[in-house]
Amino acid sequence: MKKSHLVYLSFVFLLTSCLPFAPTEPIQVANPGEILYQESFADNTSGWDRVLNDGGIMDYDSGGYRILVRGADMNFWSTPPGNFGDVRVEADVTKLNGPDENRAGLMCRYQNGNYYFFIVSNDGFYAIGKFTGGQAILIGQESMVQTEFIEADGVNHLRADCIGNTLTLYVNFNQVASTLDA
């Protein structure tokens, strides 16, 4: 029997400056602390990926964004329309069913398949890393680290700050990690 993983997301992006590399599309600019992009998922044409295949589903659902992963060792993600630089990204994530050993999280600086990621699992672990050249690499840690701040059976409010080369993860309004990527 295949196990299912469901996650609902609600996003808020805050801009604090600009990317250090040349993007393929213009960077959206705002003053520090201003909301640059906010998504309620009420409009199913707002630009997020809609996928239905044997591996899973990504789609708008009841005012949220649902990600269902049907197989082990699979990753599904979607990014908002636009190009953002230094950001604060926030989302509420909920596991609806499936095992507690799972992953949900946030990304920043997605460019040509490369990005930073901030992940948590319902069994209480987190990690910060980057995906580059087809490889996932954890930054500042050798493996996922346990924290008491993750709610196994509830909503987890995640926040990721990508400011310059500093990457910071918050879980339920508590900073759990901060690291530098040189």
Where are these regions (language model features)?
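Extracellular carbohydrate-recognition regions
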Residues: 25-52
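Bacterial signal peptide processing site
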Residues: 19-21
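Localized edge beta-strand/strand-to-loop motifs within extracellular or lumenal beta-rich domains
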Residues: 154-168
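C-terminal motif of bacterial Sec signal peptides marking the signal peptidase cleavage site
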Residues: 15-17
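Short, aromatic/His-centered strand-loop micro-motif at the edge of beta-sheets
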Residues: 134-157
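Secretory/extracellular carbohydrate-interaction modules
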Residues: 69-133
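Short, solvent-exposed beta-strand-to-loop segments that form ligand-recognition rims
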Residues: 170-182
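Extracellular glycan-recognition surfaces and repeat-rich motifs
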Residues: 43-73
